[in-house]
């Protein structure tokens, strides 16, 4: 809770809405990762810190469902592009598609942070 609160305070200086919620979710996950290795449980911890009606919560639920449906992250990436692609959000670097890639990479990376980094850094080359 403290990590999410600090992230909210810091993010609120220059952002609002989904960007703040994304920061809270990741901060909570990161702080809990010192004692928990299961990504699904870490995601639950992060989601508990953001509002139920947040776009980030909806995005996380969709990515979890696609992760359960598809063994290959490329298929999940296609769903992200169709539902949360950069063409659907304005700005140079919108948090929604970027956060989707982070969550996808963490879920498909499993217990390998190296694999997660490979996925998240490879995915953008498959352009939305």
Set out the residue ranges of the language-model regions:
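Accessory "access/gating" subregions that flank catalytic or transport cores
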Residues: 1, 8-13, 27-124
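Hydrophobic, membrane-interfacing alpha helices
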Residues: 19-21, 25
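Non-catalytic, conformational "gating/processing" segments within enzyme and secreted inhibitor domains
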Residues: 1-2, 18
């Amino acid at each position: 809770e403290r990590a999410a609160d600090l992230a909210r305070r810091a993010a609120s200086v220059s952002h609002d809405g989904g960007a703040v919620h994304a920061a809270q979710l990741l901060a909570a996950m990161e702080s809990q990762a010192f004692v928990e290795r299961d990504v699904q449980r870490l995601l639950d911890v992060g989601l508990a810190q953001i509002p139920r009606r947040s776009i980030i919560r909806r995005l996380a639920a969709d990515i979890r469902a696609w992760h359960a449906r598809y063994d290959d992250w490329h298929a999940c990436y296609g769903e992200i592009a169709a539902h949360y692609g950069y063409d659907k959000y304005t700005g140079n670097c919108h948090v929604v598609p970027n956060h989707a890639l982070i969550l996808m990479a963490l879920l498909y990376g499993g217990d390998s942070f190296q694999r997660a980094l490979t996925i998240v850094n490879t995915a953008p080359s498959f352009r939305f």
